Amino acid sequence: MRTNFIYHNANLIAGVDEVGRGPLVGAVVTAAVILDPQQPILGLADSKKLSEKKRILLATEIKQKALCWSLGRAEAEEIDQLNILHATMLAMQRAINALTIQPDFVLVDGNRIPSLNMPAQAIVKGDSLVAEISAASILAKVARDHEMQILDQQFPEYGFAQHKGYPTKLHIEKLAQFGATPFHRKSFAPVRKILGL
């Protein structure tokens, strides 16, 4: 799955991906995963192309079989202070730094890499091309969706379990009706507009 992207001296490759750049609420969540070549995981794919049930099953398998995995995050307040791009890079750094095994090489989904003390490469559409990035994509998505379920219990009127914080018609309507929660990203235009900022 990653034949074109192997760093010639790398044995331990970490894949990194993020979920939650677009939502109006909550953290951006990242994951870093070092897979075990002796325990391949079938069915890895971009998390957006998998059903919720399949993602949850795969997340459990990834956590059991991976050599190492970790999550990172940047909260809504950090997103507002830094902007979403810099907050995403910070969350990726946190995920990589939280790994209990240091990778030889890091493959990051997208076209930018965070500042790291190890070699790294950005892979456009990496969540569909690189097993480690697919695994990271799944862990980050399952973790963030779970957080949205919890937020939905705290603020049931917003429908977070349904739209996961993305700027859907329903979310914008509820935002206009009820105002922003403390977890909304105040720097994002629809929230700023509601708050009159």
From Swiss-Prot:
Residue numbers binding a divalent metal cation: D17, E18, D109
Cofactor(s) demanded: Mn(2+); Mg(2+)
EC number: 3.1.26.4
KW Nucleotidyltransferase (keyword) present: no
Location relative to the cell: Cytoplasm
Domain (RNase H type-2) ranges: 11-197
Record's keyword annotation contains DNA repair: no
InterPro entries for the chain: RNase_HII, RNase_HII/HIII, RNase_HII/HIII_dom, RNaseH-like_sf, RNaseH_sf
SUPFAM superfamilies: Ribonuclease H-like
Catalysis performed (reactions): Endonucleolytic cleavage to 5'-phosphomonoester
Domain of life: Bacteria
Gene Ontology MF term list: manganese ion binding; RNA binding; RNA-DNA hybrid ribonuclease activity
Gene Ontology annotations for the cellular component aspect, listed alphabetically: cytoplasm; ribonuclease H2 complex
Cofactor note: Manganese or magnesium. Binds 1 divalent metal ion per monomer in the absence of substrate. May bind a second metal ion after substrate binding.
Keywords tagged on the record: Cytoplasm, Endonuclease, Hydrolase, Manganese, Metal-binding, Nuclease
Enzyme's top EC category: hydrolase
Gene3D superfamilies listed in its UniProt record: Ribonuclease H-like superfamily/Ribonuclease H
Pfam families, A to Z: RNase_HII
GO biological process, one term: DNA replication, removal of RNA primer
The family this protein is said to belong to: Belongs to the RNase HII family.
Task of the protein: Endonuclease that specifically degrades the RNA of RNA-DNA hybrids.
NCBIfam families tied to this protein: PRK00015.1-1 (NF000594), PRK00015.1-3 (NF000595), PRK00015.1-4 (NF000596)
Protein's UniProt name: Ribonuclease HII
UniProt source species: Haemophilus ducreyi (strain 35000HP / ATCC 700724)
